[in-house]
């Protein structure tokens, strides 16, 4: 990886603490980018029917479903969540905090009840729509909805 252990290490001539805090949103955005595009690929018919559908077949979706995946799917997901640490220097303890946050966020968005009422952050309602439509192409993102909006795959909840 591209991790570092001394919190006082400076990159790009930036203050080490400024850089440390800057890497948080940068890592989350990169994770979301890798996840979005790899997740879209997982919804191609042959991959969805043979691999990714294993994650989508469980009803109702719950936090436990976030960890239920085909082993190939799990490894591809791991690429999305670890690739940012290969690309940008990240403080080693922060890497672990971000990975734990990613794990818990996955549990949260599979809860299927919480509505953050924020069109820019992926929430359980949004991800529930993704699971409802299965192979169809909606709401692929993990943290944020910008890639879904840019690529035309965002589907908002219907208000009754």
Residue ranges of model-derived segments:
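Juxtamembrane helix-loop-helix connectors linking adjacent transmembrane helices
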Residues: 1-31
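Transmembrane alpha-helix/helix-exit interface in multi-pass inner-membrane proteins
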Residues: 1-3, 28-49
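Short, mixed-charge, low-aromatic patches
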Residues: 8-11, 34-38, 82
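Generic detector of bulky aromatic hydrophobic side chains
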Residues: 12, 19, 34, 117, ...
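Hydrophobic alpha-helical transmembrane segments of multi-pass membrane proteins
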Residues: 21, 25, 37-38, 68
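Alpha-helical transmembrane segments of multi-pass membrane proteins
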Residues: 24-35, 97-106
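Cytosolic/stromal cytosol-facing helical appendages immediately following the last transmembrane segment
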Residues: 42-160
């Amino acid at each position: 990886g591209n991790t570092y252990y001394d919190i006082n290490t400076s990159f790009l001539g930036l203050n080490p603490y400024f850089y440390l805090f800057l890497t948080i949103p940068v890592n989350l955005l990169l994770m979301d980018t890798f996840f979005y595009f790899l997740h879209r690929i997982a919804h191609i018919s042959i991959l969805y029917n043979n691999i990714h559908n294993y994650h989508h077949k469980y009803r109702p979706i719950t936090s436990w479903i976030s960890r239920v995946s085909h082993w190939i799917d799990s490894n591809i997901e791991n690429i999305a969540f670890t690739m940012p640490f290969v690309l940008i220097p990240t403080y080693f303890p922060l890497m672990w905090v971000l990975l734990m946050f990613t794990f818990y966020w996955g549990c949260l968005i599979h809860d299927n009840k919480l509505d953050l009422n924020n069109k820019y952050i992926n929430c359980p309602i949004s991800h529930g729509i993704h699971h409802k439509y299965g192979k169809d192409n909606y709401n692929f993102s993990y943290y944020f909805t910008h890639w879904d909006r840019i690529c035309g795959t965002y589907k908002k909840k219907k208000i009754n």
